[in-house]
């Protein structure tokens, strides 16, 4: 069985503005995600990412997100932006992901027929060195679409983040249903792609804390 975390970690992804990152830090968010995947509406240049990196508060993880990027591109980001975690959303294999000597998370798509074949053993065999997994509706991420949470692999002893259509309105139920290590949100706290909404950010954090408090009190 999974051991429930004492509290649910929070990752705000697709950050593009310094002010949004500062507010995330003030709200006690555990990690901020910076996207380097080509074609993303939240894509950052390395120079923009460095400017954001300088404003991140201590003890907040910086997660660099990639999707089928070249090794050279990733090495450049690792060297200049100095992320504390890497996140891979493409066809990257374990050997590639661990080349960069930074802990990594692997995104697993959960929508469609492909998700029916996902099991814990398969994940461990394919990504034995992953620090954790992110279960999202689609590989691309940031789609705002949910998936059937009952499809999550059972007996997963690695930390996992729940993503895909998570919002301030449904994150309480999502935590109650899946008891994740963390939740990962992007479009659910936005006014438009890359532009976060301060009120939604606050509400999201409040709902996560409410869910944690209810669980710790043993309230079903």
UniProtKB/Swiss-Prot annotation:
Keyword Transferase: no
Biological pathway: Amino-acid biosynthesis; L-tryptophan biosynthesis; L-tryptophan from chorismate: step 3/5
Any matching Pfam family: PRAI
Molecular function terms, GO-annotated: phosphoribosylanthranilate isomerase activity
Transcription found in the keyword field: no
GO-annotated biological processes: L-tryptophan biosynthetic process
Catalytic activity: N-(5-phospho-beta-D-ribosyl)anthranilate = 1-(2-carboxyphenylamino)-1-deoxy-D-ribulose 5-phosphate
EC number(s) per entry: 5.3.1.24
Keywords for the protein's UniProt record, in alphabetical order: Amino-acid biosynthesis, Aromatic amino acid biosynthesis, Isomerase, Tryptophan biosynthesis
Stored InterPro entries: Aldolase_TIM (IPR013785), PRAI_dom (IPR001240), RibuloseP-bd_barrel (IPR011060), TrpF_fam (IPR044643)
Origin superkingdom: Bacteria
UniProt family annotation: Belongs to the TrpF family.
Protein's name according to its UniProt entry: N-(5'-phosphoribosyl)anthranilate isomerase
Organism from which the protein derives: Xylella fastidiosa (strain Temecula1 / ATCC 700964)
Encoding gene, per UniProt annotation: trpF
